[in-house]
Amino acid sequence: MEPGFWHEKWYKQQIGFHQQDINPFLVQYWQRLALPAGAKVFVPLCGKSLDMCFLAEQGHQVIGCELNELAVQQFFSDNQLEMTQTVEGEHQHYQTEQVSLYQGDIFTLPKRITQDVTAFYDRAALIAWPEEMRAQYAKQLANLLPSGSLGLLVTLDYPQETLNGPPFAVSPNWIEAHLTDDFEIQALACQDVLADNPRFVKKEVPWLNEAAYLLKRK
């Protein structure tokens, strides 16, 4: 999955992965993390997700990382937020009062940027990677997170052979096999969301499960 793939998607605005509403699992389960209002929350591969607005409304300081510059700029313009822009090593740093976004490669994001986060939220990052790259991303996420930090992970699972990702299918078995070395994992919910996703229906995907997990960095 080359960076050019995602840049092309954003420049052509082929962003079906961008949700127009706040993720229901985020609304339903975020309070389970029991974070203080001022907690710093890391959002990897954040795009221009409205979920970051929800997190900021909970009083959190949001730190996001996004590869594409247009996605970051659209987050601030779509939400009518004034921001400042500076250079932070290999990354462009965009900041407003409660949201701080780093535009660039997550694999070169300095660990000091996330060293004092207390939580993370991954809805569209893990499922963005094909299987041959997913474990590498999961290790980098773990590397960026301090021990004890809590996270809400949202995944999609479906018969991968029925549709070319992204989003890619991530099964409970994959979670168990690849995340347990670095995280304590608690499954929170799983539901079929096929009817809400016309692209999957059109491709005759037989089922599409969205699942939520509570994670704790070991």
UniProtKB/Swiss-Prot annotation:
Name-wise, this protein is Thiopurine S-methyltransferase
Name where it's found: Cytoplasm
Q: Looking at the record's lineage, which domain of life comes first?
A: Bacteria
Give the source species.
Shewanella sp. (strain W3-18-1)
- Name the EC number(s): 2.1.1.67
Q: Which keywords fit this entry according to its UniProt record?
A: Cytoplasm, Methyltransferase, S-adenosyl-L-methionine, Transferase
This chain is encoded by the gene named: tpm
Query: What GO biological process terms does the UniProt entry carry, in alphabetical order?
Result: methylation; response to metal ion
Which molecular function terms from Gene Ontology are attached?
A: thiopurine S-methyltransferase activity
Lineage, broadest ranks: Bacteria, Pseudomonadati, Pseudomonadota, Gammaproteobacteria, Alteromonadales
Residues binding S-adenosyl-L-methionine are 10, 45, 66, 123
Q: Which GO terms describe its cellular component?
A: cytoplasm
